[in-house]
Each structure stands twice: as C-alpha cells, then as structure tokens.
C-alpha cells in the first residue's frame, strides 16, 4: 500500500492501526468475520471505476463486457452454493436487499409479521425507526419467556389475528434454528408471502449445519459477509423462480412477469443506482471459497465452538437465552450477575475482547444499556480457534466480569488475549 502511504499517510495510519487491533484482539461480535486476502484484493481493483447499471447483457452503459463476466461468475457460484434457481448479487447491503423485497411484495401500509427486535429480530423487520416500520404496518411474534424459543403455535395464532400479507423469518440475536416447514404452513394458512432473511446464518446454511430455507420460502435475502465470510454486501435468492401471484404483467406482451423480474427491478432502478462491481467481484471470490469442502468444515466448527463457549459460561453460572445455541452465537442474560450489557461490553473491551451489548427477551433496560451480551464465534474460528480455545475465552470473560472495574484483571487478561492471538495470526500489519 505504498501509494496510499505516500498520498494519504493519515488514512494509511488508520488502516494500519485497525489491522493491528484486529490482529491483537478477540473478535466476538457475532456479525463480524475476517475476509480472506483474495476477497480484499478483489475489492481494491480498477473494477471500482466502472458504472454498470442494469444486468449482464442488458446494461445502460457501454464497455461492460468485462464486468459482466464478474457478475455472471458471482451469480453462477451463488446458485450452486445454495442450489437455487435465481439470484441478484447487486444489493449494496442486506438492508438494500430487504428493501427490494418490501418494494416487491408489499404496498405502503400493508401489514407484515416479523420477529420482535427486542426478542432477537432485526431493524429492517419492522423497527419503528426503520423504513420497514415507517412505511409498512409491522406486527410481531416473539419468544416464550420460559424457554427463550419461538413457539410455532403462538406464531400461528398471531398470524391468524393480524392477517399479514408477508411473514418474515430471520434474526440478529436468536441462538436457535428455524422450522421453515412450520412457518410455510402458517403462511399458506393466512395467504401470506414467506421471506427469510438469513444474513446471520447464510454461511451455516451453505455449509449444511442449519436447516435450508430455500424449499419453503417465497424469497430469501442475505448479507455476504458474517458467517459467509465474503465482502460486505447483500443478495436476494429464489429457490425456484415463479410467476408473480400479484398478476403484474409485461407492458408490451402482457405476459405475467416472473418474480425474479420484479425483484431485479426493485433493486435497480427501484432502490439503487449503479452496482459496485469491485464488490460483486469480491462476492464471486467469497462464493468460490464457500464452495470448497473446507468451508463446510469451518461452519461445523463455528457451531461446535459456540456450543463449547456456551457450555463453559453456563458452568460458570451465566444464564443463556434458550439455554444454549444451535448456531454461531450465544446470548447471555446478565441480570443474575447484577451487570448491564453496557458495563460488560466496556469491561471486556478494556481487556482486548470485543463483544456487544444486546437486548434480551423481556428486557427492562433501554437498547443503549441492555441486560444482555451477544457473543459470536465466526471470526475467531476463521483464525483457527477450536472448542478448547473458546472454553478458555469463556474463562477469561468470566474473570473480567466478576469485577468489571478491576483494571489489573483487565490488563492481565489483555496480555493473555494478545498471547493467544499471536498463536493464531490473522493479517500481517505490513499489508497496510
């Protein structure tokens, strides 16, 4: 990066410091991961210079024959990865992919049913401060207070009560798998579309360690980072393409449009302008990596590690929402420890451990304080951590949280963290 160092030493210094931070610390934020050098190299190329509004073979600009191939590779690999009929790899982020689904399936003011944000849902599933809760009528289902799990009978009752036009599945802090077949039965009963946002679990689904939503849903969205370990971005998928049931037709021929056509139009020109071709190329690289047998092994290790960390925390007296995990994260309810999520997050960060405060079901604290702590295993599993290391991580977390204001303990744990990370190197700081 000599050109950057010479041209803008301040930004070069920022990047170098961030590489150092990632190298030296324990990254336990469940939505974060470490992209490969190949993925990062694809993003830092001349492809960033090219405008390519439209789709391969049907662009609004000339000179797209080369970038067309990059997008075709991304689409082909994504379809192979998820054994699906159609994908759009252009969404800049998961939120943009989600907005295209709303634009396609709903009209402003329509009712949809999603997982309550305070029970593990996501902002784009109906939060009143997000477009999804501003433009549409959001209703919610949640988890049971005793079990921390979704009760499908309660979901059915709620769906019959509110009669949604769409039901959404997916979460940012739900540690269990979803019963897609049961969700589809409920959606069919009330005549609703079923949409799965697999942003958090896309890699685990691709690796075969979680249930597959494709056979049961009308549409699926995802990010391409998180457990999928590609670049930051979004994607929309259809298990099978089908004629849109809303009866929308092509202007000239009068034929019924396919759902894929409506979703393509909802991405561009509906919610975005030009696609980011350097990121789409990086998505193609990430998908190729995820098609390797080693990626399936990685995803199984992610789950094994989360379960090992959760078991050790439970042994040390921590309450886990749903009493464990099926996926990449554990959610700790800290109320029995007399701690807030904010206090825990700050104490751990001082010890070189990055996690995030999080609402827990039936939380009585604000989103800026919270009663919970969310911990994830994808990033450190990428660095080669196994169950033994994650049991050690749980022990260090407990040591810090026993007295979150003890600076000596924080300093000692930070040294221990650095030594552990040195055994599992990530990036060479010289890359910056």
Curated annotation (Swiss-Prot):
PANTHER family reported in the protein's UniProt record: SERINE HYDROXYMETHYLTRANSFERASE, SERINE HYDROXYMETHYLTRANSFERASE 1
Positions of transmembrane segments: none
Subcellular compartments: Cytoplasm
Organism: Salinibacter ruber (strain DSM 13855 / M31)
Gene (name only): glyA
Entry annotated with the keyword Methyltransferase: no
Family: Belongs to the SHMT family.
Keywords: Amino-acid biosynthesis, Cytoplasm, One-carbon metabolism, Pyridoxal phosphate, Transferase
Protein name, entry field: Serine hydroxymethyltransferase
Protein task: Catalyzes the reversible interconversion of serine and glycine with tetrahydrofolate (THF) serving as the one-carbon carrier. This reaction serves as the major source of one-carbon groups required for the biosynthesis of purines, thymidylate, methionine, and other important biomolecules. Also exhibits THF-independent aldolase activity toward beta-hydroxyamino acids, producing glycine and aldehydes, via a retro-aldol mechanism.
Disulphide bridges: none
Binding site for (6S)-5,6,7,8-tetrahydrofolate: 117, 121-123, 366-368
């Amino acid at each position: 990066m000599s050109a950057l160092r010479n041209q803008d030493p301040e930004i070069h210094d920022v990047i170098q410091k961030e590489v150092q931070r990632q190298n030296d610390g324990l990254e336990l934020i469940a939505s974060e991961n470490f992209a490969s050098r190949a993925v990062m190299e694809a993003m830092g190329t001349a492809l960033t210079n090219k405008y390519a509004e439209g789709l391969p073979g049907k662009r609004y600009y000339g000179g797209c024959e080369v970038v067309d191939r990059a997008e075709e590779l991304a689409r082909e690999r994504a379809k192979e990865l998820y054994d699906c009929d159609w994908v759009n790899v252009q969404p800049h982020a998961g939120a943009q992919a989600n907005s295209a689904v709303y634009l396609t399936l709903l009209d402003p003011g329509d009712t949809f049913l999603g997982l309550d944000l305070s029970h593990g849902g996501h902002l784009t599933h109906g939060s009143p401060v997000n477009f999804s809760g501003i433009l549409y009528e959001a209703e919610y289902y949640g988890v049971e207070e005793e079990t921390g799990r979704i009760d499908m009978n309660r979901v059915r009752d709620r769906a019959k009560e509110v009669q949604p036009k769409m039901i959404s599945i997916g979460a940012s802090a739900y540690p269990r798998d979803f019963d897609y077949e049961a969700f589809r039965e409920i959606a069919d009963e009330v005549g609703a579309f079923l949409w799965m946002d697999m942003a958090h679990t896309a890699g685990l689904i691709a690796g075969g360690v979680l249930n597959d939503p494709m056979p049961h849903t009308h549409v699926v969205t995802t990010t391409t980072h998180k457990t999928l370990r590609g670049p930051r971005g979004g994607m929309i998928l259809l298990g099978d393409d089908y004629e849109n049931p809303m009866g929308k037709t092509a202007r000239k021929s009068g034929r019924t449009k396919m759902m894929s056509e409506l979703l393509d139009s909802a991405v561009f020109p509906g919610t975005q302008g030009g696609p980011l071709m350097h990121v789409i190329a990086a998505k193609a690289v990430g998908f190729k990596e995820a098609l390797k047998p080693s990626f399936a092994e990685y995803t199984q290790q992610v789950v094994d590690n989360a379960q090992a960390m959760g078991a050790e925390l439970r042994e040390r007296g921590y309450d886990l929402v749903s009493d464990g995990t099926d996926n990449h994260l554990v959610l700790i309810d800290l109320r029995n420890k007399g701690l807030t999520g904010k206090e825990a997050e700050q104490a751990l960060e001082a010890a070189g451990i990055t996690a995030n405060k999080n609402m827990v079901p039936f939380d009585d604290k604000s989103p800026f304080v919270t009663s919970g702590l969310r911990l994830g295993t994808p990033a450190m599993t990428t660095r080669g951590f196994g169950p033994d290391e994650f049991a050690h991580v749980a022990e260090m977390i407990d040591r810090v949280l026993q007295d979150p204001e003890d600076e000596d303990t924080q300093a000692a744990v930070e040294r221990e963290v650095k030594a552990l990370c040195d055994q599992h190197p990530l990036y060479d700081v010289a890359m910056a």
